[in-house]
């Protein structure tokens, strides 16, 4: 899910949607309005799920989408290779999630982990 907001209301550390990917804002630089133009904002972001750095330039008054990012808790049911089967502790739904190299030591069967969910995608936190 996502909601709409203006570029001028965004801040560092928040999230926005760029190229249909939820991204975390690394930095925002705004320029002064010129004689015939509106103020522009240059926004540097990094994808939450793909890790790709992106940069966009848009007018401060333009509209953009902000993803709803939720952190949830789950229990590890099983591990096979680099995939883990998790069960959400509130909804009791089962799903599989890829284990990244930096999280391999933290994931054990029976242990609770936190994960990020946004726009239908999930990632270990």
From Swiss-Prot:
Principal location class: cytoplasm
Gene that produces this protein: eIF5A
Any Gene Ontology biological process: positive regulation of translational termination
Subcellular location: Cytoplasm
UniProt record similarity statement: Belongs to the eIF-5A family.
Pfam families recorded: eIF-5a (PF01287), IF5A-like_N (PF21485)
Record's keyword terms, sorted: Cytoplasm, Hypusine, Initiation factor, Protein biosynthesis
Function: Functions by promoting the formation of the first peptide bond.
One Gene Ontology cellular component: cytoplasm
InterPro entries documented for this protein: IF5A-like, IF5A-like_N, NA-bd_OB-fold, Rib_uL2_dom2, Trans_elong_IF5A_hypusine_site, Transl_elong_IF5A_arc, Transl_elong_IF5A_C, Translation_prot_SH3-like_sf
GO terms of molecular function: ribosome binding; RNA binding; translation elongation factor activity; translation initiation factor activity
Record SUPFAM superfamilies: Nucleic acid-binding proteins, Translation proteins SH3-like domain
Protein name, UniProt field: Translation initiation factor 5A
Modified residues (Hypusine): 35
Species assigned in the record: Methanosphaerula palustris (strain ATCC BAA-1556 / DSM 19958 / E1-9c)
HAMAP family hit by this protein: eIF_5A
Entries under NCBIfam families matching the protein: eIF_5A, PRK03999.1
Disulphide-bonded residues: none
């Amino acid at each position: 899910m996502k909601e709409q907001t203006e570029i001028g209301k965004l801040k560092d550390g928040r999230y926005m949607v760029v190229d249909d990917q939820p991204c975390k804002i690394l930095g925002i630089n705004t320029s002064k309005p010129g004689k015939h133009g509106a103020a522009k904002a240059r926004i540097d972001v990094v994808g939450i799920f793909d890790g790709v750095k992106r940069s966009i330039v848009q007018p401060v008054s333009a509209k953009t989408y902000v993803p709803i990012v939720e952190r949830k808790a789950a229990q590890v049911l099983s591990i096979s290779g680099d995939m883990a089967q998790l069960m959400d502790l509130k909804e009791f739904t089962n799903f599989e999630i890829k284990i990244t190299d930096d999280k391999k030591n933290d994931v054990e069967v029976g242990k609770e982990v936190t994960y990020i969910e946004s726009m239908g995608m999930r990632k270990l936190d």
